[in-house]
Design a protein with these regions (language model features):
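Membrane-integrated ABC transporters
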Residues: 1-33, 37, 45-61, 74-78, ...
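ABC-type nucleotide-binding domain
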Residues: 327-610
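Short intracellular "coupling" helices and adjacent cytoplasmic loop segments at the cytosolic face
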Residues: 47, 83, 91-115, 119-121, ...
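Helix-loop-helix
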Residues: 48-53, 62, 144, 148-162, ...
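An intracellular "coupling" helix at the cytosolic face of ABC transporter transmembrane type-1 domains
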Residues: 11-13, 99-103, 119-132, 136, ...
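Transmembrane helices of ABC transporter permease
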Residues: 11, 15-28, 39, 69, ...
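Hydrophobic/aromatic residues in alpha-helical transmembrane segments
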Residues: 33-37, 58, 74, 78, ...
């Protein structure tokens, strides 16, 4: 995964190289300063020679100034490299996500992808900057300081080299303990983001049902989960610090003790002891910096794996080698089609991680999940075969969860079938260029989405170069023109995030108009008039008949009144087609359709009458 992620830093190879070079020059200046300090003490102060004090003092100031310049340049190049790396990663991830099918997105979840695009990439950015600065600085400082220590006093230097081994062991143990915890932390971030996203997008429903306390409890639990894991990880990192400080203080006492004896014995000068003390502290501080780098790498390794999973994910749906670039007509044919959603073992395993179980129980649980994953999957659609002629209006009705939305998703190839084939315009949908197919099969999904911007900007999602007249005509067909003209700025009215400043029915009509602007061969409305009154619903269908008679129209609805005048009606039940015919034919031959009709007309006849 590291190779997959790091290839996006290649564009910033030069600043990534220059930063360590300037860092090395800064370190070289800094590590020589204690050596000059010894000259000031021994050849200047102790020798009562102020000329040497000035000479070596000015040399020290010059070296400090150079160190500052080199350090600043190193920091600038490191910042450019790390932020550029993060920018490229975000671009690469976004481009990759755009290629994902619905199935790929289901695999990661929306909240999981948001966490990866924000928190995980920021972790990698910080780690990369630390690596090209501190990971270079610490070893160079350590090596040069060790050489200088041996040069000044090999006897005293040899006494503390064993300390390096102890610190290295502590750092290794820290990595082994904290890596698994940080992996869990970022999974909990996904759950936290999901909770926030769900609550904010449904805030009106939350308030309408007075569920604020329930949502707060759910959110607090997600926050507490992240808090507990972070405390667990941080406490283990902090626990190492007292041990390291104890080692450092012990080394200081040893230096003072043995250094004092060597000075008294005439084997060492005061200046040498001072510089030796500084160099030994440099070595110890370098070891601590290395430990910090290990911690940062530990945190970022989990992020690298999560980013790598997205970048290496193979899209389930791709363009064929020689795609068909034209959809000739709106004919649709389902040939013995079966489909099932992929079983996501990863999500179930993640849910199980919240439970405290012993190793044996965890292993048994994983084995059981794997067996379930290998077992035959429940089919959402099974053995569907039917023909729809170009220009026909098809109604689609059935109970909740019977596969209506899945059925229409296969037409625009949002998912691929498991068995059989779906044909549009006499070609298998797998033969088409994806953009070509989806431009000609316009879908208004069950969950309508509007984006921040003006009404015109939202409409032009359907056709980027649409004129104002084309937009108005589409809105007239969707019965949206009237309420748009009543808005203060008309078609230039700003749509707030998520379309929060328009009603559900208005949002649906805008989405229908957006789809109509594409002038598709096939128009699919997935329960897209559910928030529209029956009179407006009837006017929209009338506009379809008069303005787009050659377009194949598939209308999913829970209301018989919305589809009763369709050329044919599909009745679905638990993934199969239970009936296919006109309203009159189904009333005579299909008990399910007849029952739905009688329930609606007798139970709410006034509402459904046109």
């Amino acid at each position: 995964m590291f190779k997959v992620v790091l290839r996006h830093a290649k564009e910033y190879r030069l600043p990534s190289i220059l930063s360590p070079i300037f860092m090395a020059l800064e370190v070289l200046m800094q590590v020589l300063i204690p050596y000059i300090t010894a000259f000031i003490i021994d050849r200047g102060i102790s020798a009562n020679n102020m000329g040497n004090v000035y000479k070596y003092g000015l040399t020290m100031i010059g070296m400090a100034m150079l160190a500052m310049v080199f350090g600043s340049l190193s920091g600038i190049f490191a910042a450019k490299a790390s932020t550029g790396f993060a920018k490229n990663l975000r671009k690469a991830m976004y481009e990759k996500i755009q290629t994902f099918s619905f199935s790929n997105i289901d695999h990661f979840s929306t909240a999981g992808l948001v966490t990866r695009m924000t928190t995980d990439i920021t972790n990698i950015q910080n780690a990369y900057q630390m690596v090209i600065r501190i990971a270079i600085r610490a070893p160079i400082t350590m090596i040069v300081s060790v050489i200088m220590c041996i040069k000044i006093s090999a006897k005293i230097s040899g006494m503390f080299f064993g300390v390096l081994v102890i610190i290295a062991v502590l750092a290794g143990a820290l990595m082994a303990i904290t890596v698994p915890i940080f992996k869990k932390v970022f999974k909990k971030y996904d759950a936290l983001n999901a909770s926030v996203q769900e609550n904010l997008s449904g805030i009106r429903v939350v308030k309408a049902f007075v569920r604020e306390d329930f949502e707060k409890t759910k959110f607090y639990k997600a926050v507490d989960d992240v808090y507990r894991l972070f405390v667990k990880a941080e406490s283990r990192m902090v626990a190492m610090m007292p041990g390291m400080m104890l080692i450092i203080y012990t080394v200081i006492m040893m230096i003072c003790w043995f250094g004092a004896h060597y000075i008294v014995a005439g084997e060492m000068t005061t200046g040498n002891l001072t510089s030796l003390y500084t160099y030994i502290m440099n070595v110890l501080m370098s070891m601590m910096m290395v430990a910090m780098v290990f911690v940062m790498i530990t945190m970022s390794s989990a992020s690298v794996n999560r980013i790598g999973q997205v970048l290496t994910e193979e899209p389930d749906i791709e363009n064929p080698e020689n795609p068909v670039m034209v959809v000739p007509n709106g004919d649709i044919r389902f040939d013995n089609v079966s489909f099932s959603y992929k079983y996501d073992l990863a999500k179930i395993e993640e849910e199980e991680k919240n439970r405290k179980k012993g190793p044996m129980r965890r292993r048994k649980k994983t084995e059981a999940l794997e067996e379930k994953n290998d077992a035959p999957k429940a089919k959402t659609l099974e053995g569907i075969s039917l023909d729809i002629k170009s220009g026909e209006t098809i109604g689609l009705i059935g109970g909740t969860g019977c596969g209506k939305s899945t059925f229409v998703s296969l037409i625009s190839r949002l998912y691929d079938v498991d068995e059989g084939a779906v044909f549009v315009g006499d070609h298998n949908v797998k033969e088409y260029d994806l953009d070509t197919l989806r431009n000609e099969v316009s879908v208004v999904l069950q969950k309508n989405e509007l984006f921040t911007g003006t009404i015109l900007e939202n409409l032009r999602w359907g056709k980027e170069d649409a004129t104002l007249e084309e937009c108005i005509h589409a809105c007239e067909m969707a019965c949206a023109d009237e309420f748009i003209r009543n808005m203060p700025d008309g078609y230039n009215t700003k749509i707030e995030q998520g379309g929060s400043n328009v009603s559900g029915g208005q949002k649906q009509r805008l989405c229908i108009a957006r789809a109509l602007l594409k002038k598709p061969k096939v128009l699919i409305l997935d329960d897209s008039t559910s928030a529209v009154d029956t009179a407006t619903d009837a006017n929209i269908r009338k506009a379809f008949r008069e303005n787009i008679p050659g377009t194949t129209k598939i209308i999913i609805s829970q209301r018989i009144s919305s589809i009763s005048d369709a050329d044919k009606i599909i009745v679905m039940g638990r993934g199969t087609v239970e009936g296919f015919g006109t309203h009159d034919e189904l009333m005579q031959t299909n008990e399910i359709y007849k029952e739905i009709y009688e329930t609606q007309t007798k139970g709410s006849g006034d509402f459904d009458q046109q």
